[in-house]
């Protein structure tokens, strides 16, 4: 029996943070042996919000290094840049004929991005990036797509496009299902709902222990816990949300200590620093190896792109045949 196929992707914005790990990478790593996986470096998608392409290649390499250091296995799953597989653009063009402007304007994720990034004039590419995302997924006939709740509307658009193409031209594409990430996101160090490089509120997977300590020292905690012995409210404390992920075996002790006033914020942050640093340490070690062996990283990318290209060519020819385009 053939394994179901998964298409996962990230926009390359440089080095990854622990929010990327919790929200995506951890899930990808756990799925790589169970499914047939393809991992996409979505470099075209970067251009939807930033036209400056000077750093895209280097950011792609940095992200790939983090993928490898965190535990993705290139022997199992190809890793490749979207821009190097020309079939992405061709399928995107075809799919753009199947998606209406009204449907894209109703997409809540795009609405949120426009609001959060204060975008006044939305580009055609930004409005239509769920169509490009549909091409990314369906070019490899993805059955499942690991996403957070905020990306589910995009998967629904992908399903609609697959259905419309199949009805119009004949059966080619599956209708992919979202595979929700259990621990979808970590809040930023400033208390913002999302950890984001653009907001400067991250702990990187490449941060050393001292850097993590410095960053966590400034992290937002319960404003009512002014003195060490004041009882705290873990449910409103940012640091406690990190403990839930990185200190699972101590979580009851930490919660009890906070509520009773026995555990002060400084000690709580130091404990969190220690546990996050211990988690990151093996990733840092592997990252150092790949930084010193960049030719190996580039070879992994080339191999992944060659493997992805073979699959993409087969799919696009099938599409052309169904559409009688030759």
Language-model-detected regions and their locations in the chain:
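N-terminal Rossmann-like or analogous alpha/beta NTP/dinucleotide-binding catalytic cores
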Residues: 2-135, 288
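Conserved nucleotide- and phosphate/pyrophosphate-binding catalytic cores
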Residues: 153, 159-326
